[in-house]
Amino acid sequence: MNKALWGGRFKESMSEQVADFNQSIEVDARLFYQDIKGSIAHVTMLEKTHIITSDEANQIINGLQGIIEDYEAGNVTFKKELEDIHLNIEKLLIEKIGPVGGKMHTARSRNDQVATDMHLYAKEMTEAIITSIKALQHVIIDLSKQHHTVIMPGYTHLQRAQPILFSHHIMTYFWMLERDKARFSEGLKRINISPLGSGALAGTTFPIDQQYTASLLEFDDVYANSIDAVSDRDYVLDIMHNINLLMMHLSRFSEEIILWCSEEFKFVTLSDAYTTGSSIMPQKKNPDMAELIRGKSGTVAGNYMGLLMTIKGLPLAYNKDLQEDKKGFFDSIDTALQSVQIFTGMVDTMEVNAAHLSNITQNDFSNATELADYLVTLGIPFRDAHEITGQLVLYAIDNNILLKDIPLAHYQGVNKDITNDIYTKLDPEHAVNRRLSDNGTSTKSVMNQIAKAEQYM
């Protein structure tokens, strides 16, 4: 095998098996643009501080830009024996412009180089995830406004509980996503710090200007400690943690959609574009996209725990274990972006079976709390009202009727002060619009909630 760029101290080259085990180019090739961006900033700084000449800097920068052109034209092949994206690019540069290309790495280690690449990539991907979350939030708001009068059963323990507005239920996910978005935005503060100039771990003897490279790369600051800069990946774990919460919320929403589009619920109908069929059962229309998103939430959880376990026992400073920070991280980023984008399209094209939803609450016992509350207004203590209502529900079940079908005379046998207005109180629309608390399910409250959500956007 060819001698490695770091091979001056070695008498023997790696075996092919060891080189293949050691390489990471198949994973970190993704950092191609970030690596060149960081190198151009570094070389620009080397020129500014007179560590290299203007002519040398121009040759290197032009060479790097030429490598980008070659790459985009499909004329670049990365080599495993060069280990990673950093050495592959450096080798390409030296081949293109000669020995002056070797000056690019002056005052820099691969340790601060890869950390810089990862910070740049993490920042870009975090911003992309935030943008994708916003798009989904817009769809949720639109869906809520479109169906703001539709009543559905609300659930606890997956049992019908109380009538609520469909829009109130759907807006729940807007606020979950809003917190997800806030976590990603807040995390940018920890990502937007430059490790460049930290060297392998101890800094450098060259008169570099780290604040200048930080500004060129649009970082807010420079790491205060060079060891910290190259040895930790907490900002990666931070993003992966946030992805886990995001995917958990999408998984919960997916689970509901899976239930809702079943024959047993029939709350919604998914577009054909987001479903699949069966190879043996012709009638099937499967919510595979929702199921995949639900399943992938487990995958990103595994990625997160994998990196957490990798880092937890590492001594300072850099260790090769940190090469394992990328595969699960990149997969989690891809999964999050794809999942949010697919989910956005699925919800945007989803049909709400409004008439069916409203009919359900007209024919169940989700209005039982209204009856208990009504009895309280007659002076009956709530615990007694709760007991009486439970007995009335049991009476209705035994007689195969609903609360609205119980004769007034029977109600008055419970309490003589009950009047005909009890039937109005039992109406689901009346029940919904009595929930006037600021965050309740009344039409007024939900429309105010939607208006508040639009302000966040």
Swiss-Prot record:
Cellular localization per UniProt: Cytoplasm
Reaction(s) this enzyme catalyzes, per UniProt: 2-(N(omega)-L-arginino)succinate = fumarate + L-arginine
Record-linked InterPro entries: Arg_succ_lyase_C (IPR029419), Argininosuccinate_lyase (IPR009049), Fumarase/histidase_N (IPR024083), Fumarate_lyase_CS (IPR020557), Fumarate_lyase_fam (IPR000362), Fumarate_lyase_N (IPR022761), L-Aspartase-like (IPR008948)
An example Gene Ontology molecular-function term: argininosuccinate lyase activity
Listed GO CC annotations: cytosol
Pathway: Amino-acid biosynthesis; L-arginine biosynthesis; L-arginine from L-ornithine and carbamoyl phosphate: step 3/3
Record's keyword terms, sorted: Amino-acid biosynthesis, Arginine biosynthesis, Cytoplasm, Lyase
GO biological process: arginine biosynthetic process via ornithine; L-arginine biosynthetic process
Domain of life where this protein originates: Bacteria
EC number: 4.3.2.1
HAMAP family: Arg_succ_lyase
Family affiliation: Belongs to the lyase 1 family. Argininosuccinate lyase subfamily.
The protein's name in its UniProt record: Argininosuccinate lyase
Organism: Macrococcus caseolyticus (strain JCSC5402)
Gene: argH
